[in-house]
Amino acid sequence: MSRRNTDAITIHSILDWIEDNLESPLSLEKVSERSGYSKWHLQRMFKKETGHSLGQYIRSRKMTEIAQKLKESNEPILYLAERYGFESQQTLTRTFKNYFDVPPHKYRMTNMQGESRFLHPLNHYNS
């Protein structure tokens, strides 16, 4: 099996694992430990295979999931912060506002559409 195929299989496996673990804190250290590669090497492989940086991919996937939950449910923002591994509601609010340009409570209460910034799981397109 070629190096390229091995890298693609590794990244595909990591993408699956990230999706299964979006509701927990996902640090680069934790993901690289899972992969068996150094942080530096994993980030380089991930960028090469997906076109996304690993940290940005994880952040974007979490923000997409949270935005969808805000529209689909009445779950408290504090609960979503805890559920998706943020240190506090304030940390989630700051991250969400930086990503969508509005805080979560305003996003939920308006008809704002954030879909243009949604990042759906890459494995659904690459499989």
UniProtKB/Swiss-Prot annotation:
Q: Care to name a GO molecular-function term for this sequence?
A: sequence-specific DNA binding
Induction pattern: By various antibiotics or by sodium salicylate.
What is the annotated signal peptide range for this record? none
Q: Tell me, in a sentence or two, what this protein's role is.
A: May be a transcriptional activator of genes involved in the multiple antibiotic resistance (Mar) phenotype. It can also activate genes such as sodA, zwf and micF.
Name assigned to this protein: Multiple antibiotic resistance protein MarA
List the keywords (alphabetical). Activator, Antibiotic resistance, DNA-binding, Repeat, Transcription, Transcription regulation
Q: Which organism is it from?
A: Escherichia coli (strain K12)
| InterPro entries tied to this protein | Homeodomain-like_sf, HTH_AraC, HTH_AraC-typ_CS, MarA-like
Transmembrane stretches, by residue range?
Answer: none
Q: Which residue ranges does the Swiss-Prot or TrEMBL entry mark as DNA-binding?
A: 29-50, 77-100
Q: Which GO terms describe its cellular component?
A: cytosol
Record text on subunit structure and interactions: Monomer.
An example GO biological process term is: negative regulation of DNA-templated transcription
Question: Which stretches make up the HTH araC/xylS-type domain?
Answer: 12-110
